[in-house]
Amino acid sequence: MPNITLLKRMLVFLLLNNYFINHFNCVKCKNLNTLCIHNTNLRKTVEVKRKEATKNQIKKEVNKSDKLNVQCSPPQNIYLSDRSEDKYYLNKNKNEIHIIHFGNGLHEKYENLPIENNNYNEIIISKYNTKNKENTEKDLYTKHINKRCYLNGNPINFKILTSLYKWINSKKLHKHIKSKSAKVDKQSPPYMSIYINYGFTKPKLLFINYLSTKYKNNGKNKYLKKYLRKYEELYEKYTYELDEQNDTDVISQNNREPMPNYSIDDFLIQNKNKNYKVTLVYDYISNLHNNEYQNVESVNNFIKNNELFDINEWKKNNKPYLIYKYKYKYKNPINKQIHFYEYDYYVPKLITYEEDISTEPKFVSPNLNSTKCYNNSPINFLTTSGFSSRNIDTFGKERNKIYSFNTPTDVKRNIYFNDLIKISSSYNQHFFHNLNFLLNLYTLQILIRDKTAIETDYIIDKFDQLKDKLIQLNTHNSLKHNNNNTKPSSQKYEERSSQDSGSFINSYYKTDQATPQNADYHYEDVNSPQTFVNFEDNIKLNGKISSDENLKKKENTKNEINDNYDNELDREISRHLTHKKNLFDDKIQIFKNKYNENILEDTDFIKLWKYDQNGEIIEALNQVPVPKIYLNIDAPKYCLWKILQNSGKNAYSEIPTPNRKLEAWRQQVNLKFFYKQNFDTSISLRNISKEELSNFKMKIVESTNQNEKHHSDQYTQINCQEHGKDNTQHDDKNNPNFRNYLNDKKTHKKNAESNILQTDKITYNVSTDEKRETQYDVKGNNPDTETNNEQSTVNKLKEKHKKAFYTLVVRDGIIDEILSDDISILKKLNQELKEKNESNEGKGNDLDATEQRENEQVGPNGEKKTTSKIFVGSFFNIKDPEVEYLINKELYFIPEHTNWYKKNTQPFVRGQIGKQSRKFDNDYPIYDYRKSDFGMAKFSALNLASIKDCAVLYLDKDIDLSDKFFHIIFISTSKNEDENLQNDQSYVVYENIPTDKQSPNLEKKQPSDEIYNEDEDHETSDNLLQNDQATNSNVEINHQDDKGNEPNSITNNIQKNNNYKKNEITNSIHNPITNPRLVLYIKENSKINIHESHISLNNNNGGMVNALSRIYLEQNSKVNHILSQELGKSAWYFHNVSVQNGINSNYKFVDILLGSLSSRVNLQIEGSQGSKQQSYGLSLLEGKQNISQYEMFHHEHSSMQTDQLFKSLVSDTAHSVWRSRGRIERNAIKAKLNTLCRSVLLNLGASAVAIPTLEIIPSDIEEANHGATISDLEEEPIFSLMSRGIDTNIARRIMMKAFVNEILEHVPDENLKNKVYQKIFKFSQKYKDESKKILRMTNL
């Protein structure tokens, strides 16, 4: 082989190598400057130089042509392709390698050219240096016309092209071009009009690309569609198009490579911890508007120290961001004037998808080091912490939009991962709305974090060590206190003065504490060391004690100082556990070292408030007054780490996660909207009076008058009129009792008002009392417009009504002792029960001795313990050790999680449940994956994690309270209820977008095209403040210093250069999450009635109520449990009711569901031998409500009986779901199980789903039935009523009342019944027009 051919082939081989091309690029084409390179990798570095070279060459040619005034020939060394960046070189030198690439159909296109003799071959190549010239011409035409040709010869003969150019510029061709072809681009060179006008494929000169795969350009982003994964199929639809092709090349190159399984720590190590300093900030900022302990002046300083991103860098990159503006009023407790404060902070805005695209299940590889993250999903690093690395499955293309613990609003992977790391999990409530219920919103954020489980376990261990240390201190102090009773007073004082720490179990909210005062009624700082020094100096100067009276006074003052000091230490401990939230991540080592030291020595957060004897704040460092009940939140007994010493901290390790076969959540059609809610902790801090709860408290008809009430109800059902008034009220118009009622009306009002002012110190409007009284009418009418007899009948009914024996009010998950009834009622009842017990046992001779002996029992450490027969109140007020142990054991019960570890409850995954599983009795599951009806384990875990308090009702054995009702009211408030926050500037979120770009997912509620300027916002806010000042007489505007406005000045300077559009997203919308919990423990042979109510005082309230009720019955006990739900129309309600029924016990459950946007009640009953359980439910739906109820009755033992009935009235476009599951195990012989659901659809838009199931294993059962019906109102009864002269509207109302009365028979509360009837009246009024249309059609 000759050397020339060898050199040529070696040259081709070297050029095919990327490394050689890179070296070739480095030497800037000095030796091979005539090569035409078409390589994406090389274009990234050479593109700028090519553009400059081509522009210079074109300018030179244009200048020459302008000077000569002659049409120049096209440059012989440049060809332009269809894209601006594809510019290629051709050299004038001969004997070099040249590349020419024409599109398909070249022969046909050149035949149409006006060239003499059709000499198109000369256009392609003029000369050839090969031996057989004729053969090469034939091969060129026959074989290589549709391929990329690589030839070695002379350059193209441009003489023919110039002749063509001159001919094209003629008049005839210009007319031909204008009529048939497109216009020529002005920027393109003249000779390119040949390709443009005749539709030729422009030359795409690809260098040494003959052996590679062909490239097909689809006209769009070529690499995205080819290389994006399935979960990024919506990339082009929901993202802006990239301008430069280089960016798409980078993206496609990253997407081709699979993402490695590395944790956050690995990522941060690779990036040298640059981004780690601004990561994982707690939700402290988002809760500033509702924080009780934050000083107003330090807000701006906190924002500066915890900025999530640099605004300068963010705006240089033209990225969108959010502005959170808060403005609230607070009353200064010293001068009694109203002050204003407004602040804002900035949060980066990430681009998210609108639809759920997580179609593939996420799994964790076995070799993954971190237990807090998932494969190929960097977003899960921040959202799924706190739970184990179990396989989290989704439902598929459609079902995953319903229930998925991953990210339905999925953030783009790889590209924005650096920005994603900068976001704290607390801000996921603004970006990743589907995982709000997994986030810890209160003190347990230390446990559910974005780090590994090692640090979490370390913190829990430190909690345990701290508790042991405090217990030792407590026992040591208690022993000293007992020894001091036998020591002289001087020795007592010396020992007390040497103590540096206090008791841990002192009750925090004893408001009757005495504190030292000065003559001017100003309190001294009991924690300052000067008070101790001065006190000791006085003792040393006096020497001996003059008299016993002075000694007692000094001892009392010193005891008060020590008690207050102990309380301050307790507060300081709680603040170390809950307040220093910003020291967990970026300063984790300092946080750990803090626990290694003696925590009692640090006194940074001791000074909080100073109180008077009534518990009112007279001086506060934070200058924000808080109601007395909310002062208990950070008390030592309210710290959650005390609860987590048992199984509570293990509840997060192996919680079962529902998989794609879960059937219960399929019917929950509106959960996708739930994922997009912005939940927070913005509860209301306003004062709530007892008068506001009068319409929600129980009104029970006495047993002697039940028959009269029953007859009156029957009479009202028949004699109804269209306007909703009862005929029975017209018969008593001349009743003389009404005159007496009118005469005594004013006196009753004054007496009631004075009593409330004396007892509760709360003023209210008399008109509100009248409105509350008027709501006893069944039809919801106003008695003021009625006649005299109507007022008298209402007055009579009032006299017959009685209230609940005791009402316990729980406000936002915390027991409110002010709104609850007086605790002396329970103490009196407890004493009566003890006396009755003593009399029954024959030990009632000396009641004083027995009372003292039982109420005061000395423990092993010398502390006093008390026993109780009944307890109703907060879990943290329990003093009986037996009660605390029993309640504490049930406090950590989580449905599904606790049952998961039962015997024979492992999931069965070998096939369909039924055929194969019955071959293996030991492996038969109870709560298996495939038929798990609830899927509420994570909601229950969140309830335990975010618990602040727990309502407890304990009843000792052999106590019959079946004639008494205990009413427990759970109130969920919202920041929207506050009167001082009803302006538009209280809580506003703005989205700032660069003017040259648009956000892909912009949800504009109130769009504005104005350019954002913060100065204008401050001016408008100042105007609003001035307007508020005019309305409030004693209002003082508190303007901040220049230091507090430094962040605003920085952003103003930035926004002068970069213009952003401001779009308002939310305005004064607060959606708080509350987690109420109720524990009932009824011992053997006891009976009780419980009414549990969940209410909202404002019907417009939203948010989420995540409740859990645990009920435990011992043998031969009986419980009647009534549950009512009357939340706001925008609230989300999730409630787990878990019941353990004892041997031969009877549990009756009645639930009435009226309010909320979406409600979900899960009832799980575990029975015992001979137990009986009953369930009666009623739901009334209107609008777009979605109410669902899931019930599980588990028969594990013999002779169990279950009766279930659920009814629902569905109106408008509401949706009702009912799912029942009854399971009878092999040993549960002689069982009785009956379930039935009846749903009535009132119009065409309503819908309902009913799924009853029975799982029966034994053959020896007495009875098992299940059924469900979904229908409209029956027409025949309505027609029979209409034939008797009753209007259609009233006839439908009578039918609906008859439908619900079967459930209301089990409800003794008249207020609740009236609300059901009022809603039925609304249903009947909606069909007034439809009935007339039907009559018109019949008449025609």
UniProtKB/Swiss-Prot annotation:
Composition bias, Basic and acidic residues: 723-734
UniProt name for this protein: Iron-sulfur cluster assembly protein SufD
Recorded family membership: Belongs to the iron-sulfur cluster assembly SufBD family.
Keywords: 4Fe-4S, Apicoplast, Iron, Iron-sulfur, Metal-binding, Plastid
Pathway(s) this gene product operates in, as recorded in its UniProt entry: Cofactor biosynthesis; iron-sulfur cluster biosynthesis
InterPro entries: Fe-S_cluster_assembly_SufBD, SUF_FeS_clus_asmbl_SufBD_core, SUF_FeS_clus_asmbl_SufBD_sf
Single Gene Ontology BP annotation: iron-sulfur cluster assembly
Predominant cellular place of this UniProt entry's protein: plastid
Subcellular location, record wording: Plastid, Apicoplast
GO MF terms, alphabetically ordered: 4 iron, 4 sulfur cluster binding; metal ion binding
Protein purpose: Participates in the sulfur mobilization (SUF) pathway for iron-sulfur (Fe-S) cluster biogenesis. As part of a complex consisting of SufB-SufC(2)-SufD, involved in assembly of [4Fe-4S] clusters. Enhances the ATPase activity of SufC.
Classification via Pfam families: SUFBD_core
Keyword Iron-sulfur annotated: yes
Stretches with biased composition (Low complexity): 477-487
Compositional bias per record (Polar residues), positions renumbered to this chain: 782-794, 1022-1037
Subunit structure comment from the entry: Component of a complex composed of SufB, SufC and SufD in a stoichiometric ratio of 1:2:1. Interacts with SufB. Interacts with SufC; the interaction enhances the ATPase activity of SufC.
Knockout mutant characteristics: Repeated attempts to isolate gene deletion mutant failed, suggesting an essential role of the gene during asexual blood stage growth.
Annotated region (Disordered), positions in chain: 477-498, 723-743, 765-794, 835-865, 992-1055
Gene Ontology cellular-component annotations: apicoplast
Presence of keyword Iron: yes
